[in-house]
Amino acid sequence: MAIERTLSIIKPDAVAKNVIGQIYARFEGAGLKVVAAKMIHLSRAEAEQFYAVHKERPFFKDLVDFMISGPVMVQALEGESAIVKNRDLMGATDPKKAEKGTIRADFADSIDANAVHGSDAAETAAVEVAFFFPGLNIYSR
């Protein structure tokens, strides 16, 4: 198994619920290390740039509006099969379809306010991590 790095965002709904620590405990319990982290309030331009891949989708405006509605916690996670592990921890995009015990089943309210974002592939993970943590702002251990 390869050591991978992936991006995770704890979205405004989960930050507002004060469950950052509970979500971090799940990352660490699954063997993932937080190698970079910061809390930020995205600007509209930053959210539009980050989610540019969805620009033509009907949900784009609502997604951007939601992501700028409050602070988010952004972290780079590292570990064996980090991308798949993180996606398994998150659960299905729609919390109603997410397996019990996943982050979205436990903390998300709707398909829009779904608590977390995670990279879906190695290529997107590299781009997304670099978006939030350019240069040498990552500390493997």
Curated annotation (Swiss-Prot):
Keywords: ATP-binding, Cytoplasm, Kinase, Magnesium, Metal-binding, Nucleotide metabolism, Nucleotide-binding, Phosphoprotein, Transferase. Its cofactor is Mg(2+). ATP binds at K11, F59, R87, T93, R104, N114. Major role in the synthesis of nucleoside triphosphates other than ATP. The ATP gamma phosphate is transferred to the NDP beta phosphate via a ping-pong mechanism, using a phosphorylated active-site intermediate. Its main location: cytoplasm. It catalyses: a 2'-deoxyribonucleoside 5'-diphosphate + ATP = a 2'-deoxyribonucleoside 5'-triphosphate + ADP; a ribonucleoside 5'-diphosphate + ATP = a ribonucleoside 5'-triphosphate + ADP. One of its GO terms (biological process) is GTP biosynthetic process. Belongs to the NDK family. Coiled coil: none annotated. PROSITE patterns: NDPK_LIKE. The gene is ndk. Its EC number is 2.7.4.6. Homotetramer. One of its GO terms (cellular component) is cytoplasm. It is found in: Cytoplasm. The lineage of its organism: Bacteria, Pseudomonadati, Pseudomonadota, Betaproteobacteria, Burkholderiales. GO terms for molecular function: ATP binding; metal ion binding; nucleoside diphosphate kinase activity. Pfam families: NDK. The active site is at H117 (pros-phosphohistidine intermediate). This is Nucleoside diphosphate kinase.
